[in-house]
Design a protein with these regions (language model features):
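N-terminal strand-loop-strand
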Residues: 1-26, 143-157
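Short intrinsically disordered, low-complexity coil segments enriched in acidic
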Residues: 1-4, 95-97, 171-175
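Unchanged
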Residues: 29-125
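Charged phosphate-binding loop/patch that engages nucleotide di/tri-phosphates or the phosphate backbone
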Residues: 121-141
Length: 177
């Protein structure tokens, strides 16, 4: 995932250095068995950078050849740092940080610096895609949940947790029963 943030009027992205290849790149990795590509993206960013993220806009897929002629396809998303209090983060399994043999440096860089630092042209293309979305105001995303034939539980029959306030109750009341 290409992790981004705004710092004043500037867009910054998070890059990693891999000593084995002596390159600077966007955090990425291999999908574990029975893991979705989205879950993989979130896990790999956490392992390689120590940063928990929430995925946003999908970016292009990149295909290239690795050693032995094998083909590799990488799915990318724009991603923002998740708030520490995020329910999405609380629900995630703990991750083991990447060793310093895999990732030995992580840096937030402004776009111009990142473009110069990135080793591969396909990473620079992804950065350009992210910048275009940012300039068009299309990086901020939100979740929209559609429920067909859903029915809210009546307040009178819902056994709500006692420690929550009414606003939280309404936000967490089951939609179906």
């Amino acid at each position: 995932a290409l992790v981004w943030r705004e710092n004043g009027k500037h867009l910054e992205v998070l890059l990693v250095h891999r000593p084995r290849y002596d390159d600077w790149s966007i955090p990425k990795g291999k999908v574990d068995p029975c893991e979705s590509v989205r879950t993989c993206a979130v896990r790999e960013v956490a392992e390689e950078t120590g940063v928990q993220v929430i995925l946003g806009q999908p970016l292009s897929r990149v295909r290239y050849t690795i050693g032995g002629g094998a083909r590799k396809e990488v799915h990318y998303w724009a991603a923002r740092v998740a708030p520490g209090s995020s329910a999405a983060v609380a629900a995630r399994a703990a991750v083991k940080p990447a060793s310093t043999k895999e990732i030995d440096d992580v840096e937030w860089l402004r776009v111009g610096q990142a473009r110069k630092r990135l080793t591969y042209s396909y990473d620079r293309d992804l950065l350009g895609e992210l910048v275009d979305l940012w300039e068009d105001g299309k990086l901020d995303t939100w979740t929209l949940v559609l429920v067909r034939h859903g029915r809210a539980v009546k307040r009178s029959v819902w056994d709500r947790p006692k420690e929550r306030d009414k606003e939280t109750d309404e936000a967490t009341r089951p939609l179906t029963h």
